[in-house]
């Protein structure tokens, strides 16, 4: 079997950033999958499920309610390796096109107060596994270390 595209990226060189993982074509429609990489693979600890889960609920809520991008959001969710998340958007985009959106989203997570949307037994299959404080900490870290002064090498996969 051939390797899938996401495992052909050199994870030794990969740093936190926003990357186009793939583009899929459904007729004349394009779906862009973004790799929202938050930690350096195999260099620093992965994120725990509780903070990733809290982040997933907050990010999905923010994205689906966004005025411009909300109707284009197909999916937001964590990577199995727990080093980042995937965002799927309807449309043909490049990483630079969503830096503003991702910055707004992580500011929303960093500044969030109150009950996490959907964090109840009725709404979620694992609602007790959430850590808002760590989600906020990781959002702030990503903003400061990556998004607020993002460089070109954090927008294009390494060779």
Predicted features and spans:
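His/Glu-rich zincin catalytic helix
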Residues: 1-63
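Phenylalanine-focused residue identity feature
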Residues: 34, 62, 69, 106-108, ...
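Active-site-adjacent, His/Asp/Glu-enriched structural segments that form or flank metal-binding
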Residues: 76-148
């Amino acid at each position: 079997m051939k390797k899938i595209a996401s495992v052909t990226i050199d994870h030794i060189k990969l740093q936190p950033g926003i990357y186009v993982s793939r583009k899929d074509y459904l007729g004349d429609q394009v779906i862009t999958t973004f790799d929202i990489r938050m930690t350096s693979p195999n260099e620093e600890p992965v994120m725990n499920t509780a903070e990733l889960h809290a982040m997933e609920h907050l990010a999905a809520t923010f994205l689906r309610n966004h005025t411009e991008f909300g109707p284009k959001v197909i999916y937001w969710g964590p990577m199995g390796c727990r080093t980042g998340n995937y965002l799927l958007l309807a449309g043909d985009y490049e990483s630079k096109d969503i830096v503003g959106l991702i910055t707004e989203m992580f500011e929303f997570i960093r500044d969030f107060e109150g009950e996490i949307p959907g964090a109840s037994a009725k709404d979620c299959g694992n609602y007790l596994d959430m850590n808002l404080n760590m989600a906020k900490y990781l959002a702030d870290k990503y903003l400061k270390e990556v998004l607020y002064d993002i460089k070109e090498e954090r927008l294009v996969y390494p060779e």
